[in-house]
Structures are given as structure tokens and as C-alpha cells.
Amino acid sequence: MLRFKELYQQKIIENLQKKFSYKNKHEIPQIKKIVINMGVGEATANSKVINNAVNDLTLISGQKPVVTLARKSIATFKLRENMKIGCKVTLRKDRMYDFLERLVIVALPRVKEFRGFSYKSFDGKGNFTFGLKEQIVFPEINYDKIDTIRGMDITIVTSAKTDQESKFLLSGFNLPFYN
């Protein structure tokens, strides 16, 4: 079994119950899914770039991503409707916990000048979104084989009703916060 899943089941649930005194076990917040999005702006000029982004995201997540398409045309960006502009992957269950573990233990310590996440990254409904500027912080990515350094947006969707509950939940997984 995964370490972070065991950590949630054995310690975090108990700590959440003590702090917020829930009446029902189904009220206890949990992580529902993790969405990783990689926007590829240069795909408008070169359509082969999207394949490299898909390969990178496949290595990082362990799951094949979905290619995202433009919803409408924007002339200033030389963008037409249904053009490939990025890729995303949604992780649930065991893959979600596996990714979260690799993110916290391996990837975040490799980010340059990383002090922690701001509490302002919560959306008011218990979800947490942050961005990484480089995909090379993940050990699965070979620096010599990438064409360009790309960033990504990572959203952690929780069942928490408030940001305070979500902060306490994610702090239990050792996500570093400052403020």
C-alpha cells in the first residue's frame, strides 16, 4: 500500500477529527483528484511540440494525458478553433497518492529557491492550485532529452468545505506552506 494513503488513513483522519470534531466520518475532507495541466503556447507555430509535452506529462504522471483544444479563435495569438494548445491529466486513487508522494518528497526539494506555498493559492472552496516553472524537477524527466523547459499547473481538489480544513489536510501530507 502507498505510504501517503496509509498516512491519511491512520493519522490525518484522526487529526482532522480532533481539530474540527466532525459528526460523521463522511464529513472528513479527503483529496478527490489531482489535475496536472501543461499549456503549450508554442504549439500554434509548431504542432510537433505538443507531442513532446504529452510524452513529458506521461512520464511525470504515469498516465496518458488528454490533448486540450482551443475553444475559440483568437487572431492576436494566431489561434484557431480546435487547435491543439496543451495537455492535461487527472489522477485519482492510488496514482494520485503516488504522484503526491513523489511531488512532496522528490520534486519540491529540487525547485530552486522554494520557500513553500502561499495560503493565497486556495480558491475559497478547499481546492489548492499552484504552478511549477520546470518539468525537470521530476526525476523521470531526462534533462538531455527535452526540447524546451515547460511549466505546469497542478490542482489538488479536496472535499473540504473551507480553505482552513483543506490547509490542515494538505499540511498533514507535509506540503510546505509559509505565512
From Swiss-Prot:
One of its GO terms (molecular function) is structural constituent of ribosome. Keywords: Ribonucleoprotein, Ribosomal protein, RNA-binding, rRNA-binding, tRNA-binding. Signal peptide: none annotated. GO terms for biological process: translation. One of its GO terms (cellular component) is ribosome. InterPro entries: Ribosomal_uL5, Ribosomal_uL5_bac-type, Ribosomal_uL5_C, Ribosomal_uL5_CS, Ribosomal_uL5_dom_sf, Ribosomal_uL5_N. This is one of the proteins that bind and probably mediate the attachment of the 5S RNA into the large ribosomal subunit, where it forms part of the central protuberance. In the 70S ribosome it contacts protein S13 of the 30S subunit (bridge B1b), connecting the 2 subunits; this bridge is implicated in subunit movement. Contacts the P site tRNA; the 5S rRNA and some of its associated proteins might help stabilize positioning of ribosome-bound tRNAs. NCBIfam families: PRK00010.1. Belongs to the universal ribosomal protein uL5 family. Part of the 50S ribosomal subunit; part of the 5S rRNA/L5/L18/L25 subcomplex. Contacts the 5S rRNA and the P site tRNA. Forms a bridge to the 30S subunit in the 70S ribosome. This is Large ribosomal subunit protein uL5. It comes from Rickettsia rickettsii (strain Sheila Smith).
